[in-house]
Amino acid sequence: MKTKIRNIFILAVIIFSKSGFAISYTLDDYTKNPFGNILFVRHALAPGYGDPQNFDLNECSTQRNLNGIGREQAYRIGENIKEAGIKFLKIYSSQWCRCMETAEYMNLGKITVEPGLNSFFQGIMPKEKTLSILRERLKSIEAKQQLVLMVTHQVTITAVTGITVSSGGAVAFNTKSGESKELMILD
């Protein structure tokens, strides 16, 4: 019986370690002991699932967008980051309206559109091409070792870091080591 319990425990540890299970890292922890050079932030709350069938990248009315709670959430994320004294040399966002709006409400600086941060969840964008673009961007940042903010989607964050976060969630990522830590940016 003890062997069976031990084996189940070991299996659980393996599963969680491979599925992106992470110990939370607070903004206070982050400012005291900075980790990585990329901060991935998932767009704030945009009720629903996926995007409508009539999705058009250039037309926000055809996309799933932030609601009032999502806009407030994005604003609070920005305020928390400012209060922690964290500054970014560059801010990138997916082309999706909910990501751009999240970055705008965070109000942390000039936003640059980055197609490598786009969602490939419903096949609207090709996964491999999108991730290839993102990998090239990450390589260019790695060489400079600058702190960069990337506002994107859950599927993109998970594909790069192995960690799944909720709306408004964040992951600190080290482009050199490939390691990542979930960062609690909302109080």
Go through the PLM ranges and name each one.
Residues 23-116, 120-123, 163-187:
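Active-site-proximal alpha-helix that buttresses catalytic centers in soluble enzyme cores
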Residues 132-142:
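A short, acidic, amphipathic alpha-helical segment used as a generic capping/interface helix at domain edges
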Residues 17-19:
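N-terminal signal peptide c-region/cleavage motif recognized by signal peptidases
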Residues 1-9:
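Bacterial N-terminal signal peptides that target proteins for export
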Residues 125-133:
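Short, surface-exposed amphipathic charged segments that create phosphate/polyanion-binding patches used
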Residues 36-38, 146-152:
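Generic beta-sheet signal
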Residues 84-86, 141-145:
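Glycine-rich phosphate-binding loop signature in dinucleotide/nucleotide-binding domains
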